């Protein structure tokens, strides 16, 4: 009894259709990313206050105990920021940041000076002492002193201990300098007695990070509702928004999609709203902070109005383009089409050459998008090595699949399935990454460009198969697991995350043919 029964001839138009759709989708993805998007203008190009952390260059991180930012570097940053901002917010006194008030004063800027608190009592004492000395030395430069940032959210201090630290600072600095504590708005409602210890409330409203993430289209309305709620909850207390903003890169959360366009949309609309209610606010943040990726994934590093090289990411007026050099994606697609036509369509007829070229266009566009994602996501040599190796492997498998597809379409006959073991490998990778997304997906990107190559390639080939070996039990198990995990991810995202739906689509593209083969083999076996 044969385990690889042959099937009669069938139409090849579904395979052609899928190839064309894949190529058009790849080109269309890049084209849409390069279209200017019209947005409402900001009421002004100046912003009241912005979070300032100088750790923007490669290798810089506040977790380095020996890190020190020179006064010259801070001077350079604040001189540039003074052209756009009236105030900067800092978070710590250490690593050279105690110099900020004196330097900001030179440029006519105010400072929301931070004192960093955590569970280290000795470090807290040093921060508090330095903060008190700074406030006494430069009271005229300060818009306020913020004692602690989200320390209750992190669970590193009790409300009682935090209150004692706040009152210590309040008693030691000039009365003209107001004192506050900053945390997510929900924690102020959870610990309302903390309001008695501060001169005003500093609340963080980050629509992207809410437990129920808010889309950019509704984000400012959400901020307005929360701000009004906090004013009602704490009558007689001034309420300041200490952090608000939107990320430009990273993992979507439900309908909250990080992008340059969405960051520009949010900030412009927020500034317009803030102008109507005349509230104090601070936006996060001045510069992208690549070091945050180690804690919060890709998305953590890209909340800046300026990139890590101090270049503005978008204008505050006029159209905004997501990927200005979008044509590089088309160039990669053209290179992929030429490469595949030469290597996979070699010695084929016109139809085989065209099929290989279409596969190459789709592969080139997908790999270019994956490369762009890697540029933002990879934090070290290990990340780069693993990512590049995965892309090379995906390209090799895609090229081999394209050869089989070109052979099948060129002769109008069924193709054999190459590298069955590699299909198992990619199914395993999909299932494994799906598990990570389900149980630890908060900060994980969707590597759609990487997995598009094998998933779509095997889907096209399934429409052209001739020899059909029985898929192994392991393949069948993974072909169930990967889509089921994809469904769970979609449900976790409440059906609002387009990236999650695309991930599920890729899982189905490679998994469904496994069961189609299994059914056909069982049907044809005596």
Predicted feature descriptions by range:
Residues 347-526:
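Alpha-helical transmembrane segments of integral membrane proteins
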Residues 209-250, 420, 444-449, 469-472:
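Glycoside hydrolase catalytic-domain groove-lining segments
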Residues 50, 88, 145, 201, ...:
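Conserved, mostly hydrophobic/aromatic
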Residues 28-80, 84:
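Boundary/entry segment of secreted carbohydrate-active catalytic domains
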Residues 247, 255-317:
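Substrate-binding cleft of secreted/luminal carbohydrate-active enzymes
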Residues 107, 113, 143, 149, ...:
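Aromatic- and acid-rich polysaccharide-binding/catalytic face
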Residues 64, 100-178:
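Substrate-binding cleft of extracellular glycoside hydrolase catalytic domains
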Residues 115, 169-189, 237-243, 279-289:
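Aromatic-lined carbohydrate-recognition surfaces of secreted/lumenal glycan-active proteins
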């Amino acid at each position: 009894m044969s385990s690889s029964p042959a099937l009669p001839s069938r139409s090849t138009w579904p395979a052609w259709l899928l190839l064309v759709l894949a190529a058009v989708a790849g080109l269309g993805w890049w084209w849409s990313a390069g279209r200017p998007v019209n947005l409402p203008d900001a009421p002004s190009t100046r912003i009241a206050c912005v979070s300032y952390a100088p750790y923007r260059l490669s290798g810089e991180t506040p977790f380095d105990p020996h890190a020190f930012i020179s006064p010259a570097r801070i001077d350079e940053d604040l001189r540039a920021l003074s052209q756009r901002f009236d105030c900067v917010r800092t978070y710590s006194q250490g690593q050279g940041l105690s110099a900020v008030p004196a330097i900001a004063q030179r440029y006519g800027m105010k400072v929301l000076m931070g004192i960093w608190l955590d569970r280290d009592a000795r470090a807290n004492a040093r921060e508090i002492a330095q903060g008190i000395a700074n406030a006494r030395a430069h009271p005229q430069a300060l818009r306020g002193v913020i004692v602690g940032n989200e320390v209750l959210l992190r669970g590193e201090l009790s409300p009682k201990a935090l209150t004692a630290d706040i009152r210590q600072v309040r008693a030691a600095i000039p009365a003209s300098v107001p004192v506050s504590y900053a945390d997510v708005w929900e924690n102020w409602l959870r610990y309302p007695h903390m309001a008695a210890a501060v001169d005003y409330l500093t609340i963080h409203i980050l629509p992207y990070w809410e437990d129920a993430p808010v889309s950019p289209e509704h984000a400012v309305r959400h901020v307005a509702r929360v701000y009004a709620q906090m004013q009602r909850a704490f009558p007689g207390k001034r309420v300041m928004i200490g952090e608000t903003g939107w990320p430009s890169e990273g993992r979507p959360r439900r309908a909250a999609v990080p992008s340059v366009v969405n960051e520009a949309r949010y900030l412009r609309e927020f500034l317009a709203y803030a102008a109507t209610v005349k509230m104090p606010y601070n936006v996060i943040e001045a510069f992208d902070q690549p070091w945050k990726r180690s804690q919060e994934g890709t998305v953590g590093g890209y909340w800046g109005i300026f990139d890590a090289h101090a270049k503005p990411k978008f204008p505050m007026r006029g159209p905004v383009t997501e990927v200005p050099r979008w044509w590089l994606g088309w160039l990669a697609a053209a290179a992929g089409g030429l490469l595949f036509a030469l290597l996979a369509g070699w010695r084929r007829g016109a139809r085989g050459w065209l099929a290989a070229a279409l596969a190459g266009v789709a592969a080139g566009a997908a790999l270019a998008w994956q490369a762009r994602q890697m540029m933002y996501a990879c934090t070290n040599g290990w990340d780069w090595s693993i990512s590049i190796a995965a892309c090379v492997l995906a390209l090799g498998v895609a090229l081999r699949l394209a050869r089989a597809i070109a052979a099948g379409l060129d002769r109008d006959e069924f193709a054999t399935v190459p590298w069955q073991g590699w299909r198992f490998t990619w199914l395993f990778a999909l299932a494994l990454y799906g598990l990570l997304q389900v149980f630890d997906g908060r900060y994980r990107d969707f590597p759609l460009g990487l997995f598009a190559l094998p998933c779509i390639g095997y889907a096209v080939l399934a429409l052209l198969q001739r020899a059909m070996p029985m898929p192994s039990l392991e393949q069948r198990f993974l072909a169930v697991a990967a889509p089921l995990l994809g469904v769970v991810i979609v449900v976790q995202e409440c059906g609002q995350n387009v990236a999650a739906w695309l991930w599920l689509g890729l899982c189905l593209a490679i998994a469904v043919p496994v069961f189609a083969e299994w059914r056909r083999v069982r049907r044809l076996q005596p």
